[in-house]
Amino acid sequence: MLPLGTQLINFDLPNTITGQNYPSTQIATDRPVLIMIICNHCPYVVHYHDELKRLHHNFSEQISFVAISSNDVNNYPEDSPEKMKELWHELGFSFPYLYDETQTVAKAYQAECTPEFYLFSDQHNLVYRGRCDSTLPKSNAVSYTHLRAHETIP
């Protein structure tokens, strides 16, 4: 697991929405950052789709959001950059959705599964890493209890 206190790890990945690279230096430096390691096909990610949209809508003025997919498109063609862009439009997301083809960034963050969340303070020090909460697909409503525990997200 990436140790708490770790500085935001630099990256420069293709934004599947704009077609341009999105460097981590483009992230606002004066507010917290939520890095979300997600993908299109995973039922655990699908479980959070509506809540990710709501969370971004409610907190995008206070927190920078960045989603990254690092899945192998040979094994998961539904996670291709083209499909990522389609899903982004279909769901009405408005945060960057980046593609980590070599899995370099996911490995640097020591991501083990999807979804995995990394919340950095306004100083860009890691204050939380892990799941949103303990809900599972087709079980409870999403509560974000784990993410909220550190009090960076109200």
Regions found by a protein language model. Name each.
Residues 27-43:
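Short active-site neighborhood of thiol/selenol oxidoreductases, capturing the structured segment around
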Residues 12-32:
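A short beta-strand-turn-helix
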Residues 85-114, 127:
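Short, internal strand/loop/helix patches
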Residues 1-12:
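N-proximal helix/coil linker or "cap" segments that precede and/or mark the start of modular domains
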Residues 127-144:
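Non-catalytic, surface beta->alpha helical segment in thiol-disulfide oxidoreductase systems
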Residues 115-131:
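A short, hydrophobic beta-strand/beta-hairpin element that forms part of a small beta-sheet core
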